[in-house]
Amino acid sequence: MARFLKRGMDASAIKAADAAVRSTVEGILAQVDEKKDAAIRELSKKFDNWEPRDFRLTPAEIEKAISQVAKRDLDDIRFAQAQVRNFAQKQKDTMKDLEVETLPGVILGHRHIPVNAIGCYVPGGRYPMVASAHMSIVTARVAGVKRIIACAPPFKGGPHPAIVAAMHFGGADEIYVLGGVQAVAAMALGTETIAPVDMIVGPGNAYVAEAKRQLFGRVGIDLLAGPTETLVIADDSVDGEICATDLLGQAEHGPTSPAVLLTNSEKLARDTMNEVERLLKILPTADAAGKAWADFGEVIVCDSQDEMVQEADRIASEHVQVMTRDPDYFLNNMKNYGSLFLGSRTNVAYGDKVIGTNHTLPTKKAARYTGGLWVGKFLKTCTYQKVTTDQASSMIGEYCSRLCILEGFSAHAEQANVRVRRYGGRNVAYAQAAE
């Protein structure tokens, strides 16, 4: 039976915090919906102390920002975007339009149609999340989205140059220096100066994730991507240092980021906890990582690989780092995860920044029912049908007529009956089932 050597914060405390977030976000969305640009300006000044003449960057301002980024950093951004673009294109290539004759004269098909306009949120509060621009903007461009707008909060009193560069290189049509719930609301609801989009994508803190949840339906969303989560699955083929490093590597995202170790070795579990404490003494971002580990860190010891799989599927973590003798066992048996990182040679940071898979992934157990952001999220699979012969229309119509009457839909039945009469030459009584 799985046993905890360390538990995270009590669930009731988490629920109370979530309720407070919901209330705050609801108020901000209502304010933006009512007051539009005036609300955006007021909220930006309140939360970010940012009140520019125009939140949208001009071409000259974009070029100025890019000029402030070192050449090597620009080259690294281009390299990372090339990896994301390549994998997204390979994924898109697997999505084929379909047309098939299912019965003589009956043609069914589907087409993959890009969403028309999207808004990409790029976090930049605690850290400038340059990579989030690659994941949303580049992927949307591969999908064929026509209008891509992007928002990121100000960083130290202005646009973050590297984020602007990544947005521009990725293919954003409009770039705004605007953060938080107000940015998401502006893109989704529209203002006097920002035309609304059809879909909001990108990760963010608990407030951004809640804003997306509340806006879903008025616009589409990619998924609910809240504070980062990581699960490290390990056995005694690795040591405590590498496990602790991978746990803290994601815990540093912020004080509410869960980091969990799942192992079948109690010695490794205790070694890892000791290593976490040692590394927190020298880690520059220990303030965030240490708080996350104290409040949301967990260590679970299992008796077998099968039990580890069961626990991992229960947790349904955003990131799952597998460092065992047989990592493919988890690839073949796990069902609930955002993305798997198999073997000690890879790690979550590779996926976060550069390897090419998308880092916008499901959190809070959403991996039970969805995967992460990918090119397919920007494509609507839309079906069509056509009937090309009189015989086919009459034959399908007879079945349809009877099935409609079975459900009590007389007008539905007449849609079928009129075609049975016209194309099949049958005499069917009005609003009655075809015999």
What spans do the regions from the language model cover?
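N-terminal Rossmann-like NAD(P)+-binding subdomain of aldehyde/semialdehyde dehydrogenases
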Residues: 1-116
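Short acidic-hydrophobic, aromatic-tinged amphipathic segments that line or gate anion-handling sites
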Residues: 2-7, 174-179, 299-304
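Flexible, glycine/charged-enriched surface loops at secondary-structure junctions
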Residues: 94-100, 220, 257-262, 282-293, ...
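Conserved small-residue-rich beta-alpha loop and adjacent elements
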Residues: 101-165
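Conserved NAD(P)+-binding/catalytic subdomain of aldehyde/semialdehyde dehydrogenases
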Residues: 171-258
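A conserved active-site cap/scaffold subdomain adjacent to cofactor or substrate pockets
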Residues: 223-295, 299
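C-terminal core of ALDH-fold dehydrogenases
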Residues: 305, 313-435
